[in-house]
């Protein structure tokens, strides 16, 4: 679980509903989005939404994208990415999404509660770039390439690790 790249949901603009601490209660037909100054670079285009909510009744959320230029001025949107269901009887949903193709360098999420859905009572929302899955590591022994296992010593035992190169 990473920290969110956007302000807490309660600080976002809302068409309807009310702030509830760091979260918000959003009735059917409501939408919410961070203010334009929070527009972030699109990066890898893959993001994770972690939604903690109260499970009083099932509801749905449309996860959407708004596109921005480098001056954090909205270019267009919102455009639907996916719909997630917040099932009754649970309190957390995690959705991994890929932003659709666009030449815009920045984006903001937007969340809408469809008019046919129940109220969404979200206590916490985190949005962060989806971590890259660890790739296999290979080494060259001078004759052939072979798989390698990377570990580090924590003072008591070897612990699996991974290597990530950043350009």
Locations of the language-model features?
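Extracellular polysaccharide-targeting segments
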Residues: 2-16, 96-98, 112-154, 163
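Secreted extracellular polysaccharide-interacting domains
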Residues: 20-42, 74-78
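Extra-cytoplasmic beta-strand recognition segments
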Residues: 33-61, 94-97, 125
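Extracellular beta-strand-rich recognition modules
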Residues: 49-51, 105-114
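Beta-strand acidic-aromatic groove motif in beta-rich domains, primarily in extracellular
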Residues: 58-68, 107-109
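Residue-level signal for glycine
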Residues: 72, 156-157
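Extracellular carbohydrate recognition and processing domains
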Residues: 74-104
């Amino acid at each position: 679980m990473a920290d969110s790249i956007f302000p807490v949901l309660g600080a976002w603009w809302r068409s309807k509903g009310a702030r509830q601490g760091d979260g918000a209660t959003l009735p059917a037909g409501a939408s919410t989005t961070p203010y334009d100054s929070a527009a972030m670079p699109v990066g890898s285009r893959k993001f994770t939404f972690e939604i903690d909510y109260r499970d009083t009744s099932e509801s749905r959320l449309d996860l959407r994208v708004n596109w921005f230029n480098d001056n954090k001025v909205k270019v267009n949107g919102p455009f639907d990415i996916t719909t997630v269901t917040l099932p009754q009887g649970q309190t957390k949903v995690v959705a991994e999404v890929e932003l659709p193709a666009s030449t815009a360098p920045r984006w903001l999420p937007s969340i809408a509660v469809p008019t046919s859905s129940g109220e969404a009572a979200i206590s916490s929302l985190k949005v962060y770039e989806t971590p890259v899955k660890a790739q296999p590591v290979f080494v060259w022994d001078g004759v052939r390439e072979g798989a390698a296992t990377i570990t580090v010593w924590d003072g008591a035992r070897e612990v699996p690790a991974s290597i990530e190169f950043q350009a």
